[in-house]
Amino acid sequence: MNSILICDDEKDILDMLSMFFRSRGYRIMTAGSGQEVFEQIEKQPDIILLDINMPGPDGIDVCRRIRNIVSCPIIFLTARVDEADKINGFAAGGDDYVVKPFSPAELEARVSAHLRRESRARTGSKIRFSDDLIIDYSERSIAAGDNVIKLPRKEFDIVALLSQNR
């Protein structure tokens, strides 16, 4: 069962999305402020729906700060329609941008598409570079001897890019 962290300061939207996605078999976590997001990501959601306009740190700042911690997809779900806001969202590490009002069915299709891509990425392979060095693309980790090294997303992406173009 996939889990979704829904982050929005509007209780009506939190309640509606929670009910909608629960009825479709998702496990739901919620956050009503930027600060609550930092507490909830420890539960390792499979995907995050993130509003921009929230009390405390806004969604852009939250995304920027958690992007090196989590590798799951982040979909901005916001009333901001300006192109600059969309660009800032993607630059902060967002994977998608949905403008309110939105269709729950379309949002579910986007969530499913992102989770499908994540699932394909997780089924990647391990590559042994020597007796002591193994890169596991599905777990996003490196094993050096008996030590397993978990890297932040950007650092692993750099290692993966370099290893695939050696």
Regions found by a protein language model. Give the residues of each.
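Hydrophobic alpha-helical motif in two-component signaling modules
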Residues: I41, L49, I60-C63, R67
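Acidic catalytic/metal-coordinating carboxylates
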Residues: G32-S33, D58-D61
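Charged docking surfaces used in two-component/phosphorelay signaling
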Residues: D15-S23
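Conserved sequence signature across two-component system core domains
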Residues: C7-D8, A31, I48, V98
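Acidic, metal-coordinating helix/loop segments flanking the phosphotransfer/catalytic sites
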Residues: T30-I47
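Short, Lys/Arg-enriched segments at the junction into DNA-binding effector domains
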Residues: N2-S3, A113-R166
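Basic, amphipathic DNA-recognition helix from helix-turn-helix-like DNA-binding domains
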Residues: D9, R64, N68-F129
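The feature encodes the CheY-like receiver
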Residues: L14, L50, P55, D82, ...
